[in-house]
């Protein structure tokens, strides 16, 4: 839920001249990106907490079983932080490489839908053809989904989901690094 607004925000900064002021300030550009990361990570956590609240308090009102997070909330928050980082990194990349909101919004939304489909959000990975199952292993959405599954369904701890968390963090680092290199190249001309 964070990729599109973040990428649009970065494009708006370019069109309104804010990014020029950021570049001429004595603060390195990566500090600006870290500030965005922190801000949007808080938004990701708030979104997660709202979804959990719906599962805990609204599900029973609709005759659905209550979402049981007892003893799992800390682990779920850790996954949310890492999944949020991956989404933020992707949003930063799209916002950095886009020149207009008309580019960033549809590309961000479409790419998130495609990554969700590939990652097993729509169709469980085990139901996919074998070649798609192999492709799903490279989707950040699949890493996050598997980490959530492991905690919610298998009562796993952090050590059991460490691989997924590392992949999500490395994805964030890769996206931000590409964004910073692209930004540097664009502004050195």
Name each model feature, range by range.
Residues 23, 27, 98, 136-139:
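Short helix-loop-helix connector
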Residues 12, 56, 60, 95-96, ...:
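Transmembrane helix-loop junction
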Residues 9-41:
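Helix-loop-helix units of permease transmembrane domains in multi-pass membrane transporters
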Residues 120-174:
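Membrane-interfacial helix-loop-helix junctions in multi-pass membrane proteins
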Residues 29, 33-106, 113, 159-163, ...:
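Alpha-helical transmembrane segments and their short interhelical loops
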Residues 10-11, 93, 97, 167-189:
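Junction motif at the cytosolic side of a transmembrane helix
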Residues 1-7:
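Long, hydrophobic alpha-helical segments
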